[in-house]
Amino acid sequence: MSYRLNAVTIHVNSAKEYKREMKEIWRDITNGKLPILFDSEHNFQQGISPIYQYSNYAQNDFDLSVMGVASEFFKQMELKVIEGFYKKYDFSDTNGDMELCSQKAWEQVKADCISGLIERAYICDYESNVPPEYTKDGKAHCYLYISVK
């Protein structure tokens, strides 16, 4: 009998810890130790995309989950953007650098907060990083869904 985890969650105390922990989690996901993209028998799960969920914010602390979601998740998030519960950010890179896309997206969120363009709700935020081979334009993309007031 095979199984698949929907998510794995860790509590993060700092940005430095976050980066180190994420590398370890991704290594465990890609090698199948944490069956999110693969089931427990190492079979790839078609139609499942990895995303980050940021929640339970408290000063510099937060919970970070890596989740495997189906396309319906993104449809629901787009509806929440239209309803005004989330602001969507989309940053891309022609060289396929997903880390750079993510960095640029988070820098824009910070700038928008400082300028007053958005007021974050700090409820639950999502990040999806997509490699160029899975996008229509052949660029790496970072999509952020930031909860707003």
Task: Describe the role of every protein-language-model region.
Residues 1-149:
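A solvent-exposed interaction/effector surface
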